[in-house]
Swiss-Prot record:
Pfam families: Hormone_recep, zf-C4
Signal peptide (UniProt feature, chain positions): none
GO molecular function, a single term: estrogen response element binding
Chief location: cytoplasm
Comp. bias (Polar residues): 121-141
Lineage: Eukaryota, Metazoa, Chordata, Craniata, Vertebrata
CC annotations in GO: chromatin; cytoplasm; nucleus
Protein name: Nuclear receptor subfamily 6 group A member 1
Length: 435
């Protein structure tokens, strides 16, 4: 397996400048030049300046013209600075899968040098070099992706959900201080990844994808979601329906795990640990892909027959608002990408195989399995979509958002879930209608 994966790396382009990649460095596929530049910048605590608009084109020929924009793109693409030891010695500590997502505020602190000043007052002995780590898992050390800051007004979208519902039932304008469309999927206005040439799909990728497709249950959901015309759904009835739906989706994820092609490779203890940590994320992924027709069709019709009270609207929490806006953006992103079944099953396996979860006894084996499907997904996207060079990074950057949303959902009071899903589904229906 390692030989095949190493061969696949040789065909990759550096995600920073488009030069030929030499391997997985600090969590992402990159060339030796960008690997060394990032390491020197972090170890030497460099603070750069851009003489233009902080949006310089990064390419093999132009990457040395602006060090500020080069380091900025390293951070935006997910290079993990915490995987570098200040003494430059090897021996990685923070092995993770997929790029590390950090907030705008944290990026700004690094670029301005403030982060280095703060770290100077703390111990640096825990840092380690991860040149040989697999692609990073887009989670922080606490196993939760970093929150994504709100974008500038020029990149925000009008939310058609909660604010319009509030206006409808209260007759007053909704709050205007919320910003939507987190920026985390937009890396640069200038794509720099070299488009893949037309080629065939690797036979091993084809086999592994077919195995995942076979494990997926694509049968329609059994939970009844049909309501007579004119019937008014109460909050408790909608909540009970959401619970039944969640139960069925969870049962399907348990069945899915038992059908995975690598089920015999891990212990029951590790599977239990992985599933107990990722089940909400798996349900979310399957809801916006495999079962989206029923979720955004039948369930939307049910929620439309539920009218929240004035008190429910007033008591809707900040956590509920944040979860809703992120759900809307995730739905829009999946709709724009038109995520295929093959990509979905790979993303689901990658998300499930998170070796950073505490309590796993075979973390290295989980990591190798994760790397396998990381390469399979990249191989497939480059084969199926050769003219969309940024597609694979876009897909992978959806995963930290899925994890963040799932983690935030537990903070939303149970009694607010009916309103949350009504507003979310109403907004998504509006988005689909406009598009």
């Amino acid at each position: 397996m390692d030989t095949w994966e190493d061969d696949r790396v040789d065909q990759r382009a550096c995600l920073i400048c488009g030069d030929r990649a030499t391997g997985l460095h600090y969590g992402i596929i990159s060339c030796e030049g960008c690997k060394g530049f990032f390491k020197r910048s972090i170890c030497n605590k460099r603070v750069y300046r851009c003489s233009r608009d902080k949006n310089c084109v990064m390419s093999r020929k132009q990457r040395n013209r602006c060090q500020y924009c080069r380091l900025l793109k390293c951070l935006q693409m997910g290079m993990n600075r915490k995987a570098i030891r200040e003494d430059g010695m090897p021996g990685g500590r923070n092995k993770s899968i997929g790029p590390v997502q950090i907030s705008d505020e944290e990026v700004e602190r690094i670029m301005s040098g403030q982060e280095f000043e703060e770290e100077a007052n703390t111990s640096w002995s825990n840092n380690g070099d991860s040149d040989h780590s697999s692609p990073g898992n887009a989670v922080s050390e606490s196993n939760q992706p970093s929150p994504v800051s709100t974008p500038s007004s020029s990149r925000s979208m009008e939310l058609n959900g909660f604010s319009s519902l509030r206006d409808q039932y209260l007759g007053t304008p909704g709050p205007t201080h919320y910003q939507y469309l987190p920026h985390l999927f937009s890396f640069s206005a200038h794509p720099t990844i070299i488009p893949a040439q037309s080629r065939s799909l690797d036979p091993q990728s084809h086999t592994l994808i077919n195995q995942l497709l076979t494990a997926e249950d694509i049968e329609p959901l059994n939970t009844p979601m049909l309501i007579e015309d004119g019937y008014k759904v109460t909050q408790s009835e909608l909540f009970a329906l959401l619970c039944r739906l969640a139960d069925e989706l969870l049962f399907r994820q348990i069945t899915w795990v038992k059908k995975l092609p690598f089920f015999c490779d891990l212990s029951i203890k590790d599977y239990t640990c992985l599933l107990s940590t990722t089940w909400q994320e798996l349900i979310l992924l399957s809801s916006i892909t495999t079962y989206s027709k029923q979720i955004f069709g039948d369930l939307t019709d049910v929620t439309s027959k539920y009218s929240p009270s004035e008190d429910e609207l007033h008591r809707f929490s900040e956590d509920g608002m944040e979860v809703m806006e992120r759900l809307i953006y995730l739905f829009r992103k999946f709709s724009q990408l038109k995520v295929s079944n093959e990509e979905y099953v790979c993303m689901k396996a990658i998300n499930f195989l998170n070796q950073d979860i505490q309590g796993i006894s075979s973390a290295s084996q989980v990591e190798q399995l994760n790397k396998r499907y990381w390469y399979v997904c990249q191989d497939f996207t480059e084969y199926r979509y050769p003219h969309q060079p940024n597609r694979f990074p876009d897909l992978m950057m959806c995963l930290p958002e899925v994890r963040y949303i799932a983690g935030k959902l537990v903070n939303v009071p149970l009694e607010q879930l009916p309103l949350l899903f009504k507003a979310f589904l109403h907004s998504c229906k509006t988005i689909v209608t406009k598009e």
